[in-house]
UniProtKB/Swiss-Prot annotation:
One of its GO terms (molecular function) is protoheme IX farnesyltransferase activity. It comes from the Bacteria. It is a multi-pass membrane protein. Its EC number is 2.5.1.141. Its main location: membrane. Belongs to the UbiA prenyltransferase family. Protoheme IX farnesyltransferase subfamily. Keywords: Cell inner membrane, Cell membrane, Heme biosynthesis, Membrane, Transferase, Transmembrane, Transmembrane helix. The keyword S-adenosyl-L-methionine does not apply. Pathway: Porphyrin-containing compound metabolism; heme O biosynthesis; heme O from protoheme: step 1/1. It is found in: Cell inner membrane. This is Protoheme IX farnesyltransferase. The keyword Transferase applies.
Length: 326
């Protein structure tokens, strides 16, 4: 009976990716390189929210390079910690460590090398605050989320999401040597964005998580409760994103106007899932859009710091000043 039920369930390859995945070398696979671009995008977003934008090319390269290395180290340590768990899940049993294509010793050496390289690059090429925050992000992902929260509570991603929200702080620290209100705003935005994004994926993979006893919200509470929680966090993301108008040093009006269709689409996807919590297509659509949404927000923050956006803001303010006061 269990085998029949398992056979009837959709696989991850059927519901998540839109195209065939590229086969990566084992040493690169464990670094989880597909997660790195979004982390670097939020790092750039944190930079764009400061008066230090744009950064000099050497500092920019050191910040992004150090962030990528720290993220890679975190990915490898996560794979090391979860190799037994991955080996028991059909979806992940073919990964480099549980399949034996890469030895744990080699992976651990790689993680240490990436960590040291990240620290050296950030300390020497950026500043100690940026380096410390990057290492804090690494530790919070491996120790707080992976080791402590993930196997114990349905709120694992709510609290553990702090790891993914640290890159904006790194970006702000790299640009100015401190973290201002703009950096903390983007940190908070990523924190409230994360649950809706991750729970959409967890809805697709809930039977995998159930099989190995990981208490993800869809496993413990079911799709209906999960969809309601996603709706709450989706609306919180939309509301908080609007404060970027105030967080930006320049270009806030431009940001606010271009933000509207992004938020409209996010709410549309959230509502669609809320109306049909069992729909894998709705969960899949929300998961994909949430990634594009955060990429779009970070790109919008950067564009808002251009001379064109500043000029647009000035023209809008001039027009508003000419309106008669009733």
């Amino acid at each position: 009976m269990a085998e029949a039920i398992s056979a009837a369930l959709p696989t991850r390859d059927q519901v998540v990716p839109s195209r065939k995945r590229v086969k990566l070398p084992p040493w690169l696979e464990v670094a989880k390189p597909r997660l790195i671009p979004l982390l670097l995008a939020t790092t750039l977003g944190g930079m764009a929210l400061t008066e230090g934008w744009p950064l000099s090319s050497p500092r920019l390269v050191c910040t992004l390079g150090g962030g990528a290395l720290a993220s890679a180290a975190a990915g490898v340590l996560n794979c090391l910690w979860e190799q037994d768990l991955d080996g028991r899940m059909a979806r992940t049993s073919g990964r480099a460590l549980p399949s034996g294509r890469l030895s744990p010793t080699s992976a651990f050496i790689g993680a240490i090398a990436c960590t040291l390289a990240a620290a050296m690059l950030l300390v020497s090429g950026v500043n100690c605050l940026a380096a410390g925050l990057s290492l804090l992000g690494l530790c919070s992902y491996v120790l707080l989320y992976t080791a402590l929260l993930k196997p114990r509570t349905t709120q694992n991603i709510v609290i553990g999401g702090v790891a993914g929200a640290i890159p904006p702080l790194v970006g702000a620290a790299a640009a100015t040597g401190h973290v201002g209100l703009g950096g903390w705003w983007l940190f908070a935005l990523v924190m409230v964005w994360t649950p809706a994004h991750f729970w959409a994926l967890a809805l697709l993979l809930r039977e995998d998580y159930r099989a190995v006893g990981i208490p993800m919200l869809p496993v413990v509470k079911g799709p209906v409760v999960t969809a309601r929680a996603i709706r709450r966090y989706g609306w919180a993301t939309v509301l908080l994103s609007g404060f970027g108008v105030l967080a930006l040093p320049t270009g806030g009006v431009f940001y606010g106007l271009i933000l509207l269709p992004f938020n409209g689409r996010l709410i549309q996807m959230v509502q669609r899932l809320s109306m049909d919590p069992d729909s894998l297509m709705a969960a899949k659509g929300l998961f994909r859009w949430s990634i594009l949404y955060l990429f779009g927000i970070c790109l919008l923050l950067i564009l808002s710091r251009t001379d064109l956006a500043s000029s647009f803001d000035q023209q809008v303010m001039f027009v508003l000043q000419q309106l008669p006061i009733v």
